[in-house]
């Protein structure tokens, strides 16, 4: 018995003790490492991970490492090193680590966001980018689709005029319909249970991700029961059942002469692969229903919650800074008025609004730490050696709050993105990557930027957004999951008198 126990402990020590580094190699400074548990006892246990990593830079520098179980992770908190990882050596660091919770989400690394580097990821990213190119003009112009959902949202909010409400649900419904049009070429009708179901699935998944971090750090304990993981699996199963039903319906109605959405593009790619006309990357195995569903789920997950979350952050900051809101509304009144919807072409005139959006993305980035990358070959970052299969985390929070790069980074200052005259947008620092960069950059960046501008402009054109009756200001700390979520808050919706007068005149003329 004792012999077996000693053998077991020696085996664990061999597996989890850091291996001897190559001669002459220089590695990033590491947190202390113990057998089996690695650096876990030395990682801060309170607070948010991105902030803790930022504080660790004071001791270990802008690039450091730690070890959990048998896995080494390198953390980057400098924009030059981050761009080396994301851009200069983007292909070398384009892998994704195997993480239990994300494997559940991605059906074992299918789709785009959590897929490992390889032909499948490259193909589905290419198909997603091709889809967004459909929406650059004509009847499918993305701006028109967004503005239609903004009108539906604003008409609903007008029925709650004078009330204090939480915008989370109506914003998620609006964003879901936009993504639905991109993926399926249809929007859900008001009250459709499928629409509410998708929102509920996304909420359930977001609630689960990050709660079971020990299962991600130590895969060996996955045999232990977890109610959170079971809830997550159930949400994913129900989501996939709904998406599979939509996919089957789209297959039946597919026409190669009318390609209007993501499912059409993927079905077309599969049809071409079956007839050997799709090119070498169009492998039938990579275009299975499960691969398609994973990609659609990625677009929904990223396209709905990220934009909805940022709009909520923008509204929260406007409640904290009512004079800023008034200045933005004055610019909207002067440059747009009340007789047409805001357009992307108005960005050059509404520079304070655009600067506010950029500052929100700096101050409270959607993903304070980017989804981890993985070195697919032996490589280097700066002067340091990085072994193959090392995980690399870019701490966006550190980039966006670096005192050497930003003037008073802990203050919310939209004017930092404006020139001294306040009339031109500028880039005050290179340490700014709200959507990542390189091969793994956000495929929906164009969609997100348009949504943030048009939703904020549309809301402020029609409504005054004020503190609720209890006077409670939103908490601006946030809770990180897949995205940095703001705590629930309420805002009083008041339809603007100038808007009502303009539309009363229009209806009687």
From Swiss-Prot:
Matches recorded under CDD domains: CYP17A1
Mechanisms controlling activity: Regulated predominantly by intracellular cAMP levels. The 17,20-lyase activity is stimulated by cytochrome b5, which acts as an allosteric effector increasing the Vmax of the lyase activity.
Residues annotated to bind substrate: 202
PROSITE patterns the record matches: CYTOCHROME_P450
Residues involved in heme binding: 442
EC category: oxidoreductase
Species annotation: Sus scrofa (Pig)
Protein name: Steroid 17-alpha-hydroxylase/17,20 lyase
Gene behind this protein: CYP17A1
Gene Ontology cellular-component terms listed: axon; endoplasmic reticulum membrane; neuronal cell body
């Amino acid at each position: 018995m004792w012999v077996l126990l000693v053998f077991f402990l020696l085996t664990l020590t061999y597996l989890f003790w850091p291996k001897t580094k190559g001669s002459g190699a220089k590695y990033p400074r590491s947190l202390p490492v113990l057998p089996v548990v690695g650096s876990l006892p030395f990682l801060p246990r309170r607070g948010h991970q991105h902030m803790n990593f930022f504080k660790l830079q004071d001791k270990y520098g802008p690039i450091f490492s730690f070890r959990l179980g048998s896995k080494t992770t390198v953390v980057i908190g400098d924009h030059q090193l981050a761009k080396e990882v994301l851009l200069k050596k983007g292909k070398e660091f384009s892998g994704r680590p195997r993480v239990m919770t994300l494997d559940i989400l991605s059906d074992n690394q299918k789709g785009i966001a959590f897929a490992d580097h390889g032909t499948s990821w490259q193909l589905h990213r290419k198909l997603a980018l091709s889809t967004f190119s459909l929406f650059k003009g004509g009847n499918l112009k993305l701006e028109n689709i967004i503005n239609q959902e903004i009108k539906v949202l604003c008409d609903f909010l007008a029925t709650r005029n004078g009330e204090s409400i939480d915008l989370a649900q109506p914003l998620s419904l609006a964003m879901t319909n936009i993504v639905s049009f991109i993926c399926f070429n249809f929007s859900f009708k008001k009250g459709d249970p499928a629409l509410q179901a998708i929102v509920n699935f996304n909420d359930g998944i977001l609630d689960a991700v990050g709660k079971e971090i020990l299962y991600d750090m130590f895969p060996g304990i996955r045999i232990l029961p977890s109610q959170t993981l079971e809830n997550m699996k159930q949400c994913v199963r129900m989501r996939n059942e709904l998406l599979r039903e939509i996919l089957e319906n789209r297959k039946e109605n597919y026409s190669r002469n009318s390609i209007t959405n993501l499912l059409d593009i993927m079905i077309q790619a599969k049809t071409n692969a079956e007839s050997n006309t799709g090119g070498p990357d169009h492998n039938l195995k990579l275009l299975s229903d499960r691969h398609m569903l994973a990609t659609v789920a990625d677009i929904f997950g990223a396209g709905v919650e990220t934009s909805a979350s940022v709009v909520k952050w923008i509204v929260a900051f406007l409640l904290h800074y009512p004079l800023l809101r008034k200045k933005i509304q004055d610019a909207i009144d002067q440059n747009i008025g009340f007789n047409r919807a805001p357009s992307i072409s108005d960005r050059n005139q509404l520079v304070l609004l655009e600067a506010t959006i950029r500052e929100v993305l700096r101050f409270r980035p959607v993903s304070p730490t980017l989804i981890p990358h993985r070195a697919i070959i032996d490589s280097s970052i700066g002067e340091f050696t990085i072994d193959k299969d090392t995980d690399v985390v870019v701490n966006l929070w550190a980039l966006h709050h670096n005192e050497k790069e930003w003037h008073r980074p802990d203050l919310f200052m939209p004017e930092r993105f404006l020139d001294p005259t306040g009339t031109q947008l500028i880039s005050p620092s290179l340490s700014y990557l709200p959507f990542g960069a390189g091969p793994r950059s956000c495929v929906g960046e164009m969609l997100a930027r348009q949504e943030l501008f048009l939703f904020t402009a549309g809301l402020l054109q029609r409504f005054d957004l004020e503190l609720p009756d209890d006077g409670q200001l939103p908490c601006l700390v946030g809770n990180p999951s897949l995205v940095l979520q703001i705590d629930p808050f309420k805002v009083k919706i008041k339809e603007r008198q100038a808007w009502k007068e303009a539309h009363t005149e229009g209806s009687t003329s």
